[in-house]
Swiss-Prot record:
Belongs to the succinate/malate CoA ligase beta subunit family. GTP-specific subunit beta subfamily. GTP-specific succinyl-CoA synthetase functions in the citric acid cycle (TCA), coupling the hydrolysis of succinyl-CoA to the synthesis of GTP and thus represents the only step of substrate-level phosphorylation in the TCA. The beta subunit provides nucleotide specificity of the enzyme and binds the substrate succinate, while the binding sites for coenzyme A and phosphate are found in the alpha subunit. Mg(2+) binds at N227, D241. PROSITE patterns: SUCCINYL_COA_LIG_3. The gene is sucg-1. InterPro entries: ATP-grasp_succ-CoA_synth-type, ATP_grasp_subdomain_1, Succ-CoA_synthase_bsu_CS, SUCC_ACL_C, Succ_CoA_betaG_euk, Succ_CoA_ligase-like_bsu, Succinyl-CoA_synth-like. Pathway: Carbohydrate metabolism; tricarboxylic acid cycle; succinate from succinyl-CoA (ligase route): step 1/1. Keywords: GTP-binding, Ligase, Magnesium, Metal-binding, Mitochondrion, Nucleotide-binding, Transit peptide, Tricarboxylic acid cycle. This is Succinate--CoA ligase [GDP-forming] subunit beta, mitochondrial. Substrate binds at N292, G349, I350, V351. The keyword Ligase applies. The record marks E61, D131 as: Important for substrate specificity.
Length: 415
């Protein structure tokens, strides 16, 4: 569940579902609209716009943040950057903040969640600094184990929650919420105490927690993550950094939120894949992967790396895949010029292996394939699928298990 709290953009049960992700400033706009406490902030596309908008700020600290969807901005690096700053810059000097804006806008930011090519920064958010006394972590998310919303809270905020879970799991508190009853006053007070708020701030924090939960329900979110939720030196509670995800199934009744959606940051192949209900994420390697199931896809990538290779992508075709979707999956993964081998790994439960085979053969015949292809098929109609492959006359390397498939894919790469 904590992995989900860190990144809910992974997927799907019965069919492919994509989650809408928002940039931080968009999440803060939603928080503000729903009565949650956020510090003053503005969004700008250039230095002049920033100066005009932040005139209302006091002479306090300025926090300049590059607005991209990827996490890890603070430790990120700009390609061709000259100032040595990352995607988050904090200063008390207005001139230094303006220089940081110049450094960020128009450059590509590389973080642990982007490819080596990075993501172009077109907007920055400038927030008014607050005097932080203490940082906590709070997330509301949909949890399969609980069949409903769960609040994940920790008094150790401002850091990677997965690191907290690994090193000090006793510092993480989970509170399931009955989606019919909603969050009770007792639950919000307990969570505030779990976060180690004291005195009158227990009530203040409890109200903020309740507002965040109500927001989560009102906007059909799959995740509302506040890291950090802070206590200030003058006794206030603020949502300083926010991340939200929304289920596409809610788009018809959340038109205002889904109007935020943009594909500018996405890999064109990712946008292309979405049209065919394919879950595609580009990576930096040269072995393209076509797999059914997110777990099997990740295991496939792990074994590729274990054998010394690097995956070029994550691609889950899902359980309801058609021949046309398989055709387009092959087309999309082979459109990456870095790809030197294709690995297809299918375990057919719901998926019909013959459907996969027909789609692959059709794609190779129409598109052509100039790199080795390794195929491992098991499950429903596997014998028919193997016959389809055999009769096609295509030069396809077969494997009996995943480990063998990964090893063959890596060994087939040009030396």
């Amino acid at each position: 569940m904590l992995r989900a709290a860190g990144n809910l953009s992974k997927s799907m049960m019965k069919s492919q579902r994509r989650f809408l992700n928002l940039q931080e400033f968009q999440s803060k706009e939603i928080l503000e609209k729903h009565g949650c406490s956020v510090q003053n902030f503005v969004v700008a596309s250039n230095r002049k716009e920033a100066e005009e908008k932040w005139m209302s700020f006091g002479d306090h600290e300025y926090v300049v943040k590059a607005q991209i969807l990827a996490g890890g901005r603070g430790k990120g690096k700009f390609i061709n950057g000259t100032k040595g700053i990352g995607g988050v810059f904090i200063t008390k000097e207005k001139d230094a903040a303006l220089e940081a804006i110049d450094e960020m806008i128009g450059k590509r930011l590389v973080t642990k969640q982007t490819t080596s090519e990075g993501v172009r920064v077109d907007k920055v958010m400038i927030a008014e600094g607050v005097d932080i006394k203490r940082e906590t972590y709070l997330a509301v998310l949909m949890d399969r184990e609980s069949n409903g919303p769960v609040v994940v809270a920790s008094p150790d905020g401002g850091m990677d929650i997965e690191a907290v879970a690994e090193k000090t799991p006793e510092r993480i508190f989970k509170t399931p919420i009955d989606i019919q009853m909603g969050m009770t006053e007792g639950q919000s007070l307990k969570i505030a105490k779990d976060l180690q708020f004291e005195g009158k701030l227990i009530g203040v924090a409890a109200q903020e927690i309740k507002r965040l939960y109500d927001l989560f329900i009102a906007v059909d979110a799959t995740q509302v993550e506040i890291n950090p939720l802070v206590e200030t030196a003058d006794g206030r509670v603020f949502c300083v950094d926010a991340k939200m995800n929304f289920d596409d199934s809610a788009a018809y009744r959340q038109k205002e939120i889904f109007a935020y959606e943009t594909f500018e940051e996405h890999d064109p192949r990712e946008v292309d894949a979405h049209q065919f209900n394919l879950n595609y994420i580009g990576m930096d390697g040269n072995i393209a992967c076509l797999v059914n199931g997110a777990g099997l896809a990740m295991a496939t990538m792990d074994l590729i790396k274990l054998h010394g290779g690097e995956p070029a992508n994550f691609l889950d075709v899902g359980g309801a895949v058609t021949e046309d979707a398989v055709f387009n999956a092959v087309r999309i993964i082979t459109s990456d010029p870095r790809v030197k081998c294709v690995l297809i790994n299918i375990f057919g439960g719901i998926v019909n292996c013959a459907t996969i085979a027909n789609g692959v053969v059709s794609a190779v015949n129409k598109i052509g394939l100039n790199v080795p292809m390794v195929v491992r098929l098991e499950g429903t109609n596997v014998d028919a699928a193997k016959q389809i492959m055999k009769k096609s006359g295509l030069k396809i390397l077969t494997a009996n298990n995943l480990d063998e498939a990964a090893a063959k894919a890596v060994s087939s790469l040009p030396k």
